[in-house]
Amino acid sequence: MTARTLYDKIWDAHLAHEAEDGTCLLYIDRHLVHEVTSPQAFEGLRMAGRTVRAPDKTIAVPDHNVPTTLGRENPDQMTEDSRIQVEALDKNAKDFGIHYYPVSDIRQGIVHIVGPEQGWTLPGMTVVCGDSHTATHGAFGALAHGIGTSEVEHVLATQTLIQKKSKNMKVEITGKLRPGVTAKDITLSVIGATGTAGGTGYVIEYCGEAIRDLSMEGRMTVCNMAIEGGARAGLIAPDEKTYEYVQGRPHAPKGAQWEAALAWWKTLYSDDDAHWDKVVTIKGEDIAPVVTWGTSPEDVLPISAMVPAPEDFTGGKVDAARRSLDYMGLTPGTPLSEIEIDTVFIGSCTNGRIEDLRAAAEILKGKKIAVKRAMVVPGSGLVRAQAEEEGLADIFKQAGFEWRMAGCSMCLAMNPDQLSEGERCASTSNRNFEGRQGYKGRTHLVSPAMAAAAAVTGKLTDVRDLM
């Protein structure tokens, strides 16, 4: 048999039909749903008199619009648009009989944290959601990517998706990471090296010693931002860490089913002589703690660097850099470590897990914030409960952080947690576009530890100076 990549193997296992022009019909194992991209899809089912084809494989949770303050069940805390969307999801979940974690459920949280946490995400699966950061689930060796609302309706109705196959791209991170360097630094560094279009047309498989050394939560951070690198999806082959994470979770296989699943999962790796259409190799020891300076995730530099000048770029990037610097209010030649910060946000589907909170709390222990406001938003109610049990919440609160309820929060300006005009934020989220966190808000993407360092110094700071 021809040597295949991990992507090839998962694709082949789910291929229901292939047309002469390469258009394929794929079977979908898990469909994750949230309140923003699903209302029109469910309404389309109603109008056509259709049911959800596989309600047992469809999981819904409100996350984008929900407030993160106490008493958030009160509809007055939401804008009318947000309230309508959350109430629509409540009704649609009930009417169509799908799995649902409402705001009142401790298991509620960001859909890409809830899925793995509850054992819905398993190796070798196809996973889709009407959300671009669905690639997160690729950390389990699952083929996971975002879809549009019309596709959400198609999957709800048929449990299949029409697709054309992407090309194979390998991103290898060799060697060991240095102290203070994290999964977030890996994924930002890859995007900085390849650009936001570097993965366009590809599915990325991340591999190498530095990737293998990561925990499952670190791997989720890496895969989460595959989309910012332009890729359709990001994958990491499953291994013992994967199996250990999955085993015993509420919806993971058990008994004989576990053994059968495990046998298949152990075949999910890229063959040694598989063909790659593109290969990128980065030495792990060359990666430093990084920060974004502009308005694209590819605007990445080590914290030790200086704000670049437009003249440092070529072609169309000269004008783009000039616009970014103007929007961000930065002067070329300024050391990144001298940029003052107003706000710190720790959370999101990129960095809202328990290990992220532990890393931030380790830096904050015994210190006070030097910024105007700082908030920690756990990725799920269960993460929040665990952080409280471990004493992390007390560390955050004593440092001066707001300790919030679970949700997407300040990652995107679709709920009450937003930046004001000109407000500068060190954020553990995934996008630094103009207006992403609020009208004319300024975003610097960093790891949780780097965000904590900025909180206590009041400026972008090399976390290694505080370790």
From Swiss-Prot:
Q: Which GO terms describe its molecular function?
A: 3-isopropylmalate dehydratase activity; 4 iron, 4 sulfur cluster binding; metal ion binding
> Which EC numbers does the record give?
4.2.1.33
Question: Which PROSITE patterns does this one have?
Answer: ACONITASE_1, ACONITASE_2
Source organism superkingdom? Bacteria
Question: Has the keyword Secreted been applied to this entry?
Answer: no
Q: How is the cofactor bound?
A: Binds 1 [4Fe-4S] cluster per subunit.
CDD domains given for it?
IPMI
Pfam family of the protein (one):
Aconitase
Q: Annotated pathway, please?
A: Amino-acid biosynthesis; L-leucine biosynthesis; L-leucine from 3-methyl-2-oxobutanoate: step 2/4
Question: Record's Gene3D superfamilies?
Answer: Aconitase, domain 3
Name the chemical reaction catalysed here.
Answer: (2R,3S)-3-isopropylmalate = (2S)-2-isopropylmalate
Main EC class the enzyme belongs to? lyase
Give the keywords, sorted: 4Fe-4S, Amino-acid biosynthesis, Branched-chain amino acid biosynthesis, Iron, Iron-sulfur, Leucine biosynthesis, Lyase, Metal-binding
A biological process from GO: L-leucine biosynthetic process
Describe the family membership recorded for this protein in Swiss-Prot or TrEMBL: Belongs to the aconitase/IPM isomerase family. LeuC type 1 subfamily.
Q: What is this protein called?
A: 3-isopropylmalate dehydratase large subunit
In which organism is this protein found? Answer: Dinoroseobacter shibae (strain DSM 16493 / NCIMB 14021 / DFL 12)
